[in-house]
């Protein structure tokens, strides 16, 4: 289905953009597309018309409270997100008693599916890296902080352009500057900036997203994260982000140009003042 088409049972477009609650019909068939951070993305298909849409909801009862908090924060920001760079929810609903967001259908591949595999050519890496930077730059120009940049929040379209999703931790600059943590607590430890942890008193701003971007790009280029933790060491990510220095990418992968290696290491600077200041 073309992403601009809408099924016959889809509510009026104007109502959707007003944040109308969308009531799911009983005969809709759901198929899990991806799971990330306690949230499941599902394709919802009407068996008679063949029309479809996408919903996001908690993966389990155990994750429901946190996932609902994230989804509601994302929904509250829907009017400042733009379709040109964001996967934007257009309505909310209930799925099996759980809060859920509704999205128009779109074709994508989560960048997380490529995690752990280094991109084979430097030119291909640079092309993808630029496409990842484009929506993040647009988001920052809207005075918004993402707060959870990771492979699971980056959507790669069939034409290789990228969109951002998973805005559960996102907030406006003005909200972030008033505190040391983001508006909604949480995050994904492996990609979290030092200031986003509980162990520093530095405010979280857009440069926190740049650190997380550096983590994402480092893994795409080298096939591994800057810090390798054992299965029993996963609770210590904050320590590694604050106190450990990553190996230079050109040490891990000799074909990486020195300048590119330097760029990634600058993104991963511990203090935000020492990073690039904008995308």
Q: Which residues does each PLM region occupy?
A:
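Conserved short submotifs of the Hanks-type protein kinase catalytic core
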Residues: 96-110
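Conserved HxN/HPN-centered segment at the entrance to the catalytic loop
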Residues: 82-91
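Activation segment signature within eukaryotic-like protein kinase domains
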Residues: 128-129
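C-terminal lobe helix-coil module of Hanks-type protein kinase domains
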Residues: 190-279
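Protein kinase catalytic-loop region centered on the HRD/HxD motif
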Residues: 134-144
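AlphaC helix of the eukaryotic protein kinase fold
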Residues: 65-80
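ATP-binding glycine-rich loop module of kinase domains
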Residues: 44-68
